[in-house]
Amino acid sequence: MQKLQISVYIYLFMLIVAGPVDLNENSEQKENVEKEGLCNACLWRENTTSSRLEAIKIQILSKLRLETAPNISKDAIRQLLPKAPPLLELIDQFDVQRDAGSDGSLEDDDYHARTDAVITMPTESDLLTQVEGKPKCCFFQFSSKIQYNKLVKAQLWIYLRPVKTPATVFVQILRLIKPMKDGTRYTGIRSLKLDMNPGTGIWQSIDVKTVLQNWLKQPESNLGIEIKALDENGHDLAVTFPEPGEDGLTPFLEVKVTDTPKRSRRDFGLDCDERSTESRCCRYPLTVDFEAFGWDWIIAPKRYKANYCSGECEFVFLQKYPHTHLVHQANPRGSAGPCCTPTKMSPINMLYFNGEGQIIYGKIPAMVVDRCGCS
């Protein structure tokens, strides 16, 4: 009996020395583990708006396959930008990206931009420096954006200077070829007759799709073209080498290409604004202003709504995969927590100068956040 009492005293003494036992210790450890696992892989949610904008700039350059932003000044843009109907229509009717209601579908976009149209300006060529002692216009060089897409349309646009009296104008588009035995250097592409009235000059388009297809199949046959637009007195009205005051009137090629559509799937998420107190994963508005970047090489849009995702992702909230919660409960230390990320992204249309001075109209995929979710 005495031994039992001694054992009890020793036990009580150990309790006093060791201090009280915290019965909540295990639960706190478990909670800490859960907090650690919540978003070790998604600390980017704490990024500021400025870092998000910097990321968008890097994305755009990467998707356009540009190492740096094209160095084109506003003055150069005024000279290079054609004052022609197809380009003016693109700018006037440009679908500036808006945060319109989404159907919740998720498009499987490619990473790089998809080209829809290319406006190609003439360039200098060693093959077309002089013919018959005179410099000739025009030589067009084609990038891979045209070569590796399905050609839908190819139009040559030329500007005809105004006439003082009603006149009939004969337009000829000639293709330069290698000298034949009889000395012939040209073969006809198109010819047409136009009746012009006094007033302002006019833009005229000519279908050159067949010629362009041949050039793409046999690049060595592309030696350039000559443009003539003669009135009854033999005066050439075509602007081939712009004179002072004729900026933006240089001939150019408008090429349209097509691509195959992508499949889609369904998804949904929460929408918030900057004043929202919502702590869960949500989509927030963010406007990208290219003029603020100093990116004058982007013709349109000047700004667009990109949006971003932010918020907490608890394991029981907006689970993308139902089994994720069970896996985490079984092994809380071994599973990374879900992250608030875009679950639907859509492209933006863009009209821009590339590094070669060509005007490109196309789509840049995955530049607008339409939905956010936890995954």
Swiss-Prot record:
Compartments where located: Secreted
A Gene Ontology term for the protein's cellular component: extracellular space
Site (described: Cleavage): R98, D99
Domain of life: Eukaryota
GO molecular function annotation: cytokine activity; growth factor activity; heparin binding; identical protein binding
Principal subcellular localisation of the protein: secreted
S-S pairs: C272-C282, C281-C340, C309-C372, C313-C374
SMART domains: TGFB (SM00204)
UniProt-listed Gene3D superfamilies: 2.60.120.970, Cystine-knot cytokines
UniProt similarity note: Belongs to the TGF-beta family.
Protein's job: Acts specifically as a negative regulator of skeletal muscle growth.
PANTHER family tied to this protein: GROWTH_DIFFERENTIATION FACTOR 8, TGF-BETA FAMILY
Protein's recorded name: Growth/differentiation factor 8
